[in-house]
């Protein structure tokens, strides 16, 4: 898994928090990355209809629908995120050994199941849920700063 899913979730939560169009540079500063990377990650979110884009001086990105309707699964699917990805599996399909010739396929099935489980879990969490969790945590830990 690369960081695109986390970056996308961060950007969407910040857009929910600010409730306005924000340019990639402002998002990048808050995410602690560069604007080019933000634009790269935001493109598939726009294609999936999760965000709206606007050009011009008041342009940037905004949520295309309420944050409570955007699940983390939708974000993962838009960004093409694979949570468990293994570049190598043991064994060799050409070996004359039951274990060696089967191990790769069995392990790949297990990893595919883990990815399905991740997506199923993410279906139950929305961008708004994360915004609320952050707000509640900030208020509990620093009530003077976040009344």
Each predicted region: which residue ranges?
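N-terminal helix-turn-helix DNA-binding core of bacterial DNA-binding proteins
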Residues: 1-33, 52
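Conserved segment of winged-helix/HTH DNA-binding domains
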Residues: 67-92, 107-112
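Basic amphipathic alpha-helical segments that dock to polyanions
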Residues: 41-48
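Beta-hairpin "wing" of winged helix-turn-helix
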Residues: 49-64
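C-terminal regulatory/oligomerization modules of transcriptional regulators
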Residues: 91-147
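Key DNA-contact positions within bacterial/archaeal DNA-binding proteins
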Residues: 36
């Amino acid at each position: 898994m690369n960081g695109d899913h986390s970056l996308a979730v961060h950007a969407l939560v910040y857009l929910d928090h600010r409730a306005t169009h924000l340019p990639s540079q402002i998002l990048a500063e808050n995410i602690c990355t560069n604007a080019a990377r933000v634009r790269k990650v935001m493109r598939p979110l726009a294609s999936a209809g999760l965000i709206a884009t606007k050009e011009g001086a008041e342009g940037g990105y905004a949520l295309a629908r309420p944050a409570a309707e955007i699940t983390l699964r939708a974000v993962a699917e838009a960004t093409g995120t694979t949570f468990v990805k293994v570049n190598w599996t043991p064994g060799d399909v050409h070996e004359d050994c039951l274990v060696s010739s089967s191990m790769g396929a069995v392990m790949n099935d297990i990893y595919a199941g883990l990815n399905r489980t991740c997506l199923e879990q993410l279906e139950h969490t929305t961008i708004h849920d994360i915004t609320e969790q952050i707000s509640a945590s900030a208020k509990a830990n620093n009530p003077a700063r976040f009344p």
